[in-house]
Amino acid sequence: MQIFVKTLTGKTITLEVEPSDTIENVKGKIQEKEGIPPDQQRLIFAGKQLEDGRTLSDYNIQKESTLHLVLRLRGGMQIFVKTLTGKTITLEVEPSDTIENVKAKIQDKEGIPPDQQRLIFAGKQLEDGRTLSDYNIQKESTLHLVLRLRGGMQIFVKTLTGKTITLEVEPSDTIENVKAKIQDKEGIPPDQQRLIFAGKQLEDGRTLSDYNIQKESTLHLVLRLRGGMQIFVKTLTGKTITLEVEPSDTIENVKAKIQDKEGIPPDQQRLIFAGKQLEDGRTLSDYNIQKESTLHLVLRLRGGMQIFVKTLTGKTITLEVEPSDTIENVKAKIQDKEGIPPDQQRLIFAGKQLEDGRTLSDYNIQKESTLHLVLRLRGGMQIFVKTLTGKTITLEVEPSDTIENVKAKIQDKEGIPPDQQRLIFAGKQLEDGRTLSDYNIQKESTLHLVLRLRGGMQIFVKTLTGKTITLEVEPSDTIENVKAKIQDKEGIPPDQQRLIFAGKQLEDGRTLSDYNIQKESTLHLVLRLRGGF
């Protein structure tokens, strides 16, 4: 029968073959025709690299099938795979091999089915659809092979008494199933169980995989007491204390209960709920603190500490503060010393602008730290926007303005609808939800305004099944936007999509015009297999 072999240059070779020919034989025929040594040939069919010892019929290659020929750079490379038993396997690979190919090579050597293999490199689990070069795996790198146990995984459940229970589960188990397993082991009725993971209470109808709970994750079990009410107090060390309270208890009473449990004097306790510091004379119900609410406990250090504030003129001010002081409090102290109104002050620490409602300890500002004080000019700052026609527009803005706000100001001045505006700064397209300060756009910076043409253009996306999708796009659309349009049409999540054009994988942050993708170009869509557990 005849088959075709297509090279990366676009040339197609026709070969006479038998279904019983090995891949090695086929490479020999290609060498006769094209002079390419077999050890430099890699043959791909249906997205899989073909192995020398297998036959065409093994791969279901039939008459007039097309194989793709990719040249190996001479020599390839060796990598090592270390198993949990300590055994090390050596593999011959190419940087362009997918993780799937590597698992197939491990199966050939060790007989372990790919679906039981998990490969780890640099602490990351490797996904089947990615290549070794995607993960920067180079010659003589060592991967770690962990076996998945068939039929599920173990997780741990830790109770408030400190006891840890081990459960056998599946990623597809619901939280309800998990509570039933806990009842089997511990006799606690499900309606008295609350399960917490990553600070979130888990809902009965959801599955473990919905919450990204993987093998050997630890859940926390909190019991609901019938009647009365429990609240939780979380300390900065991460410890959680459970208290029995009444809605009519004052904050003072609550601090006394914390003192009983933890020995911390009330005058060193600050309690925070919903971002607010709680006042001693108020009650829990005043703050709408209900059963199972979590308060945060911050300790006041006795006697405070000193910090320094450096102004742009070079002057340094010394302030007496507490770690629990808010940035607002600090600005008030600066006003007392220097007469500068708080709304004209911007405080910077470790390159970050500090927000009024946060505390010094939130930013890990410790004794003798130095903050930098920058004055806001009343009425913000000016920036310039340059259009492609060469016209320059001046705008009054604040560093905290979003790109969306800026586009609205341009619309006010120039009448250009925001959805036709693309703003560029330092070579980057600016995203609507970000602020000027996120992009370090300062006074008298110049942005460039590029107009999106209405009407756009059509491109085609071809899937591995051969289906072709038509999309309406703009040259200024990012690859991320294109993946979102594919999701709208086909329901494929963007993180499972890889788009290829002219042999290159396209990166999310780039635009179609960056890749010179023009109207009626065809992109190829390859699906990433999910990594799973």
Curated annotation (Swiss-Prot):
Residues 533 form a propeptide. Keywords: ADP-ribosylation, Cytoplasm, Isopeptide bond, Membrane, Mitochondrion, Mitochondrion outer membrane, Nucleus, Phosphoprotein, Repeat, Ubl conjugation. The record marks R54, R72 as: Interacts with activating enzyme. The keyword Membrane applies. GO terms for cellular component: cytoplasm; mitochondrial outer membrane; nucleus. GO terms for biological process: modification-dependent protein catabolic process; protein ubiquitination. There is a cross-link at G76 (Glycyl lysine isopeptide (Gly-Lys) (interchain with K-? in acceptor proteins)). Belongs to the ubiquitin family. Ubiquitin is encoded by 4 different genes. UBA52 and RPS27A genes code for a single copy of ubiquitin fused to the ribosomal proteins eL40 and eS31, respectively. UBB and UBC genes code for a polyubiquitin precursor with exact head to tail repeats, the number of repeats differ between species and strains. For the sake of clarity sequence features are annotated only for the first chain, and are not repeated for each of the following chains. This is Polyubiquitin-C. The gene is UBC.
